[in-house]
């Protein structure tokens, strides 16, 4: 741990000689006070703390002054020992994180995205890696490039499973069987190393701990649940941060650190906890943790594209926090599955949550929608009406009667700023998944009759896909697998169960034929995935009971 006797010896004014030995407790970057344009910077206060204070405590007071951390007088005056100084230092966060977390001053340029290759520079060849994927948004976030690497020993960890399943029985027993067969059938990856967990509900955490090896790296996109998982492990196994020197050597934890875990566990965890935030790309450096007898590394999140538009530029800050804060998810939707009804109209009636998307059912169809995305929903006569209303909401400073339904910013002010996607044909129910946002269940009711394709309009830059309803898919597959003693696959082999959507021109009238054309283009280099290519599209959709999920194809 940090040697404060050495770090603070003879220091009367705050300087880099102190702070260089301290990392930001939120993003793990080294702290400095020399260059405002560089990461880890502190803003000097206009006046120094009371010079009558002990010199060492004066430095600590300075550290905490710039980020509004409250210190009790008792801690300053009556407990001036090295342990207190160390604890106070370990709570410090940099100006960037302080502004974003405590002052709602968020500058996306200060939170740059990283690529997979950027992050893999932190990971030695042959390392143990946990690929962290939020199950709630499956298959989005799943990166075959990580699972297929021969230079890493990779395990797939599916987080946030409580947002998909009612209880942990399916998570423990059924998901691993399903995923093993899904990976083999879909990606030709032969692996039985899959865990489904919920850090918030403590589902499978003990099993996960027993499985992962010493010196394991957590790898995934931003906001997939890495830090929440780490904090659950820290609490359960009295874990703590450890430091790495310039040679990569991990310093052994001190007896003093371990003693505090028993004497003051609440304060101990507060200091050691990983920085959990709704803000993406908060972590900027590797942070090592001692969890029981194992070392675990938290890596910064990586993005598959550094050019996509950020959600922070599109979605209202309060709505975005609700979308990203896992602990705010209402599980009653999982248990009750309360639906909203909507009938497709000739005017293009649409369903939206905050203007983040517009779902347009075909004329005459009767639909049920179960919403797993926070925020109130609203229907409009057509997309143009919805966009017009939300423009009025943004210009009214919250006084518009429909302002509570508006979750987007004024930058999305025209229909041209949305992409039009056609959903390939389906029968029954599907789940529409929006990356970093959530999903909705869409169900067509009544006797099947093809009335046209469903459409969804989404702001440019948001990734979307569909899947068969995940919970039902895994439950029914497991039942089939057990009844046949494993002879039949838990994951269907007769049809694709996930698909990308097909972008359409705004004025495209024959969307079904346009979907087939796009399907043939996407599968040009994957001929084995093609199905029903010789069928006439309009004949094909009359027989979906026998020819399920035509033109479904997921582009990894």
From Swiss-Prot:
Residues 113-305 form the CP-type G domain. Residues 1-21 form a transit peptide. GO terms for cellular component: mitochondrion. GO terms for molecular function: GTP binding. The keyword Transit peptide applies. Keywords: Mitochondrion, Transit peptide. It is found in: Mitochondrion. SUPFAM superfamilies: P-loop containing nucleoside triphosphate hydrolases. It holds the Pfam family MMR_HSR1. Its main location: mitochondrion. Interacts genetically with prohibitins and thus may be involved in the mitochondrial lipid metabolism. PANTHER family: GENETIC INTERACTOR OF PROHIBITINS 3, MITOCHONDRIAL. Belongs to the TRAFAC class YlqF/YawG GTPase family. GEP3 subfamily. This is Genetic interactor of prohibitins 3, mitochondrial. It comes from Saccharomyces cerevisiae (strain YJM789) (Baker's yeast). The lineage of its organism: Eukaryota, Fungi, Dikarya, Ascomycota, Saccharomycotina.
